[in-house]
């Protein structure tokens, strides 16, 4: 089962930029999300920041070239990540 963070908070948003905080998440989610975000046409930058492992001041940023809204790019990236994780889960359990 895939769980979602307990709290997702949009810290900043324009058409071309979105900065989102995912409470309780770490490099595990952010690295995968960053790699997938770069596969979406129109994404110029995808990055994350974790201030300190013991603090919950972390966030993810997507910046686009204007051909796609940053919010839409983030949603697409999250959907692609979910799909890849479900495919991996199916592959894993079928090969045990």
From Swiss-Prot:
The keyword Lipid metabolism belongs to this UniProt entry's keyword annotation: no
Keywords: Cytoplasm, DNA-directed RNA polymerase, Nucleotidyltransferase, Transcription, Transferase
Pfam families referenced in this protein's UniProt entry, alphabetically: RNA_pol_L_2
Transcription is among the record's keywords: yes
CDD domains: RNAP_L
GO CC terms of this entry: cytoplasm; DNA-directed RNA polymerase complex
Name of the featured protein: DNA-directed RNA polymerase subunit Rpo11
Species lineage: Archaea, Nanobdellota, Candidatus Nanoarchaeia, Nanoarchaeales, Nanoarchaeaceae
Gene symbol of the encoding locus: rpo11
């Amino acid at each position: 089962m895939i769980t979602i963070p307990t709290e997702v908070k949009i810290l900043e948003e324009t058409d071309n930029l979105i900065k989102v905080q995912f409470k309780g998440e770490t490099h595990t989610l952010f690295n995968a999300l960053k790699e997938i975000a770069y596969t979406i046409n129109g994404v110029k930058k995808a990055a994350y920041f974790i201030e300190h492992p013991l603090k919950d001041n972390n966030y993810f940023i997507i910046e686009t070239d204007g051909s796609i809204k940053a919010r839409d790019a983030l949603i697409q990236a999250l959907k692609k990540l979910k799909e890849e994780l479900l495919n991996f889960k199916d592959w894993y359990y079928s090969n045990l």
